[in-house]
């Protein structure tokens, strides 16, 4: 069983205290091609491309131009699971997971990324900003199409080493479309979270994002390897709701 989640635009590069066996990014040649493309963009072009403020565009320009795709170590990079710090990662709280759980996560959790493609928890990453939905073409393909074959092939390889061949999709649509479901030789399972608002159940973005992190943590900490045990998730008031679920979707409500 492998969980896939989205990355986060917010990143924290404060050093971590615990020593791990860090790993290098999977798709180094593709990263070189992408970062070299991004380095050609001036500040004003980044502002338009990414639809961000001039100040933020300057920061992104600086990040990309200081990016060294031939060197990933503690001087310029940090393990991905401790670097991303958006809502999903606030729910995950990776810095409070024990060493054994982080090591387990290395083989059971993957992050999708516009720049890195697929990222394992202990892969070292440098500061960047490139959302999968960015309107940029590489080799004549939009970004998620550029990554699709590469990511799907790598996932199939990882699943060949897994006993339970289930992909738990906790990524947003923007990122999960970078996986070719038809070419993925495993079961695909989506998970959704809904809130009861005045008697009607609705998916509310900020709550759903944090819940994705909470259930990721739950699966990792409990070493869950089957769907029936995922249904037992009952953190932060969420309960499995069969009325909104089917064989390809687990929905939790509160």
Curated annotation (Swiss-Prot):
GO biological process, one term: response to hydroperoxide
One Gene Ontology cellular component: cytosol
Domain of life assignment: Bacteria
Pfam family, one: H2O2_YaaD
InterPro entries cross-referenced by the UniProt entry: YaaA
Record-stated family: Belongs to the UPF0246 family.
Record NCBIfam families: PRK02101.1-3
Protein's recorded name: UPF0246 protein FTM_0239
Originating species: Francisella tularensis subsp. mediasiatica (strain FSC147)
């Amino acid at each position: 069983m492998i969980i896939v989640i989205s990355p986060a635009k917010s990143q924290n590069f404060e050093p971590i205290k615990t020593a791990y066996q860090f790993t290098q990014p999977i798709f180094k040649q593709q990263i070189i091609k992408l970062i070299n493309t991004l380095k050609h963009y001036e500040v004003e072009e980044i502002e338009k491309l990414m639809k961000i403020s001039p100040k933020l565009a300057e920061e992104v320009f600086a990040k990309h131009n200081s990016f060294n795709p031939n060197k990933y170590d503690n001087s310029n990079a940090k393990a991905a699971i401790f670097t991303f710090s958006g809502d999903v990662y606030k729910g995950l709280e990776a810095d409070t997971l024990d060493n054994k759980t982080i090591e387990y996560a290395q083989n059971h959790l993957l992050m999708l990324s516009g720049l890195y493609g697929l990222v394992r928890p202990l892969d070292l990453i440098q500061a960047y900003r490139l959302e999968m939905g960015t309107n940029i073409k590489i080799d004549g393909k939009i970004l998620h199409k550029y990554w699709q074959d590469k990511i799907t092939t790598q996932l199939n390889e990882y699943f060949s080493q897994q006993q339970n061949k289930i992909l738990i999709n906790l990524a947003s649509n923007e990122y999960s479309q970078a996986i070719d479901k038809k070419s993925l030789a495993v079961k695909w399972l989506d998970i959704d979270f809904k809130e009861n608002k005045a008697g009607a159940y609705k998916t509310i973005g900020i709550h759903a994002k944090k819940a994705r992190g909470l259930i990721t943590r739950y699966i990792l900490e409990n070493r869950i390897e089957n769907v029936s045990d995922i249904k037992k998730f009952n953190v932060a008031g969420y309960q499995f709701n069969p009325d909104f679920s089917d064989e390809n979707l687990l929905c939790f409500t509160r």
